[in-house]
């Protein structure tokens, strides 16, 4: 296949290009470096940085198969596990998302990092704020800092690293609302309330897919034939935000299945590959 890779930003790598710059995550850059090197060896791949495409541009591109991998963004309304609707008090206290911090927009003074994601991002951003001179309190409804990292045997090291950085850790505690003078915290078990004074809050909640382009293309499906388009597929974080490994697998899977016809129709839960099923038979 002849491939065109259009990147909306100035550099390739997606979220890895940003997250590799966070404390302790520089090694993750190898995920990006390896693939960029491999792509650079192939004459049939054209790369276009700084090329955010709209529906019209995609239709005019002239490619038969369109893979939309537009990623996701961190929610700014606090919706995650504790809050299924927007957190009360938004706008009363300066609030930041992980995207803000990775773009260089940092809080100052007393900062509460509210981690309702429970993977690695909350702990990493708490350390980042502490290194920037903030007085940091990490609040999480979980019983452990960066709870998911117990699966990778990193949780203890993360807790120790945060404690050594001067981060105050508050476990089993959520944030029920934002106030002008800080956050209203609540016990995950008793719902007892107290105020943690702060000048800003970093909301590490859930992520929302950047799928506007995909839905715009689907709405113009009647124009696909004239544009020479056979298939349009949404993959990676744009389809369902998840770990970097899942996004990497999604790209690999898309390429593997491109010749199978699976993208040309909705296969539902049908497997796109054959497998041998052993059963007992009467001789």
How would you label these PLM feature ranges?
Residues 183-187:
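SH3/SH3-like beta-barrel fold
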